């Protein structure tokens, strides 16, 4: 299965380019220039359509470092913006056990980002008044596989759990 999204670090030796690292849970969406945004939106639309053509609601699961990493918050906000522009209803849900209530973070550009605690039903991951058909992990699971993400057979989970750092090694 090809990755849903990825980033590649490239080394420029002046006479050749070489990929040196690939990330299946890319951060840095906030580094996209405005002229590149329509291309990112188009790619997001195409990727979602391949995975779940009837997708309307998308839940983004970020890293648990939200409270301490403002740069990463901008990354998540840009990712949310891209998928909203692609026509999806997008919400941000945290699997951080320390986040017990919806929290609004203020970004440098005066925008805010609402992050809500996820809820687990018997077979689905939801937010209050929001039931997504697709869940986008922007969390590499390097601290281990949280049980709350296991056995979600009714929802598309992208990338799949076996792509997380809890399973893979460099």
Where are these regions (language model features)?
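ATP-dependent carboxylate activation and anion-phosphoryl transfer catalytic cores
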Residues: 1-108, 133
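Conserved N-proximal alpha/beta basic substrate-recognition cap immediately N-terminal to
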Residues: 66-170
């Amino acid at each position: 299965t090809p990755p849903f999204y990825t980033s590649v670090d490239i080394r420029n030796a002046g006479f050749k380019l070489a990929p040196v690292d690939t990330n299946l849970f890319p951060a840095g969406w906030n580094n996209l220039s405005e002229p590149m945004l329509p291309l990112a939106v188009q790619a997001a639309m195409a990727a979602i359509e391949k995975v779940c053509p009837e997708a309307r609601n998308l839940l983004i699961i970020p890293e648990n470092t939200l409270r301490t990493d403002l740069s990463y918050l901008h990354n998540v906000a840009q990712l949310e913006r891209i998928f909203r522009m692609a026509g999806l209803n997008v919400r941000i849900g945290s699997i951080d056990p320390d986040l017990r209530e919806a929290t609004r973070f203020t970004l440098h550009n005066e925008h805010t980002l609402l992050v809500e605690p996820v809820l687990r039903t018997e077979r689905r991951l939801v937010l209050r008044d929001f039931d997504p058909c697709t869940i986008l992990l922007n969390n590499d699971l390097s601290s281990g596989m949280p049980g709350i993400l296991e056995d979600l057979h009714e929802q598309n989970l992208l990338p799949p759990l076996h792509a997380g750092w809890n399973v893979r090694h460099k």
